[in-house]
């Protein structure tokens, strides 16, 4: 019974519009950056004054590392050193396009551009060279008054023109590589083609310049799913050495390590990144909401996969302690707002210890009405699912159904899984299994990136089939789950149980250092 109570959602990503995918959920971090001197090496010939060179180049490296706050400060230093240096303003504007994180501060970017000139034409006229004008045209396209898909497509188009005119420009090639990941339009085949191109571009940058931060970083992003992850293992092992002062660079390798189930490496990466995040917050004297709670969530996931449950549970207490006293009516840092409940749910889901909820249904986290970002929508959707799940678990099927009724139309997997939980609570085994079969089928069309906010549906289906005395079918479900998310401990243990129940002999799965659960 304890195992059955671990039923959860396969991926919170299904709760969002089509263009917001796994990378938005799992490539997000605290809003603060953590940029020291060692950020990798960039070569960017430009027209700026001598005094502007160091801050500008440092800003470009920080931008490649997604250390947005510190990159912005560096570009502003370059502007102060040379007020007519257009590239510094275009660089600063890009720090507001945190699009892989689901954050788009276009108004702030436009305010930055206005410092350079009141119109696009006047700003482009201040470019120091034809090459810089092409950079400017791409950035200007990203912040036109249009919808985001149109803007990101125009940005990629501008960067493609730049790389065609200047094929040896590694900075342009790197920016094009990551820009292709912003574009979620078109068919699955078209999206796959963009991913393949992004991988090729990033690898070519890294091959030409092994210490380039963008080459390693963007290759990890592009390859962040089980199909492509092996192609980025070398980059994952190199990135933290390329930019050891970037907290993001310490964390990012774990995106690949999770995809191949390398739990020791996941833990090592995120222990270092969490320590760097805490050091940055302390040294800058900023609020603890600026901590990288994304890193903390990934660290806990590594602990959970190795069965280190006391260490994993302690991180719930860590989040609670560092966020004590925060006024959530004024703070709009989304990762911090939802951190404790994310950690609590993940712990219960992986360990089977639902006592962390004390037998009560948690309240939906209060949302800050000022923040309407896609990232906020993602976290609110995840929170709603988790509350609905716990409600069904304790038998409050009415509340579970009420919350599920608010899910977006595209939230097929979420809706099916809540319906399955409700059916199980009512003793309807046939509907329980049928709903999970539907969820599992739909999930096979989705990209799986990073730790799940909840259980993959094939694991849920395997649990249900095993409980219903259908172990051979459960074997297939667990095997499919491991194909989609390699080396997950719960799937491996479920598979072993199903094989025993079916009388199937098989080689013992590799150990994940996790103890078996009853």
Residue ranges and their predicted role:
Residues 55, 89, 96, 134, ...:
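TPR repeat positional signature
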């Amino acid at each position: 019974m304890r195992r059955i109570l671990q039923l959860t959602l396969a991926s919170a990503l299904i709760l969002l519009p089509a263009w917001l995918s796994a990378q938005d959920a799992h490539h997000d971090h605290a809003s603060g950056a953590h940029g020291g001197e060692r950020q990798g090496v960039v070569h960017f010939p430009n027209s700026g004054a001598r005094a502007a060179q160091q801050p500008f180049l440092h800003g470009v490296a920080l931008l490649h590392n997604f250390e947005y706050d510190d990159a912005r400060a560096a570009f502003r230093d370059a502007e102060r050193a040379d007020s007519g240096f257009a590239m510094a303003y275009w660089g600063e504007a890009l720090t507001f396009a945190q699009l892989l994180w689901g954050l788009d501060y276009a108004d702030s970017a436009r305010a930055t551009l206005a410092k350079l000139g009141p119109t696009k034409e006047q700003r482009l006229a201040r470019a120091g060279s034809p090459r810089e004008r092409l950079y400017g045209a791409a950035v200007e396209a990203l912040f036109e008054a249009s919808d985001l898909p149109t803007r990101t497509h125009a940005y990629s188009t501008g960067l493609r023109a730049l790389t065609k005119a200047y094929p040896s420009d590694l900075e342009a090639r790197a920016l094009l590589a990551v820009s292709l990941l912003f574009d979620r339009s078109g068919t699955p085949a078209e999206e796959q083609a963009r991913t393949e191109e992004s991988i090729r571009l990033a690898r070519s940058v890294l091959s030409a310049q092994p210490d380039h931060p963008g080459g390693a970083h963007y290759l990890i992003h592009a390859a962040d799913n089980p199909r492509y992850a092996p192609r980025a293992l070398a980059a994952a092992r190199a990135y933290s050495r390329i930019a050891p002062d970037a907290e993001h660079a310490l964390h990012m390798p774990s995106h690949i390590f999770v995809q191949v189930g390398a739990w020791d490496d996941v833990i090592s990466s995120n222990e270092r990144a969490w320590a760097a995040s805490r050091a940055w917050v302390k040294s800058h004297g900023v609020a603890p909401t600026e901590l990288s709670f994304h890193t903390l969530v990934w660290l806990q996931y590594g602990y959970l996969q190795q069965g280190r449950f006391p260490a994993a549970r302690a991180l719930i207490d860590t989040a609670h302690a560092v966020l004590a006293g925060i006024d959530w009516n004024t703070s709009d840092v989304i990762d911090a707002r939802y951190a404790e409940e994310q950690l609590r749910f993940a712990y219960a889901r992986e360990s089977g210890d639902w006592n962390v909820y004390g037998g009560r249904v948690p309240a939906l986290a209060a949302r800050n009405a000022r923040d309407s970002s896609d990232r906020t929508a993602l976290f609110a959707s995840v929170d709603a699912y988790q509350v609905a799940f716990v409600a069904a678990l304790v038998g409050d099927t009415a509340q579970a159904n009420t919350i599920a009724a608010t899910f977006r139309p595209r939230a097929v997997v979420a809706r099916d899984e809540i319906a399955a939980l409700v059916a199980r609570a009512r003793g309807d085994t046939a509907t329980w299994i049928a709903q999970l079969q539907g969820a599992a089928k739909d999930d096979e069309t989705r990209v799986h990136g990073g730790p799940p906010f909840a259980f993959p549906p094939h694991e849920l289906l395997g649990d249900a089939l095993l409980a219903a005395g259908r172990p051979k079918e459960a074997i297939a479900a667990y095997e499919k789950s491991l194909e989609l998310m390699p080396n997950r401990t719960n799937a491996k243990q479920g598979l072993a149980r199903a094989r025993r129940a079916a009388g199937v002999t098989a080689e013992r799965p590799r150990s994940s250092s996790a103890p078996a659960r009853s």
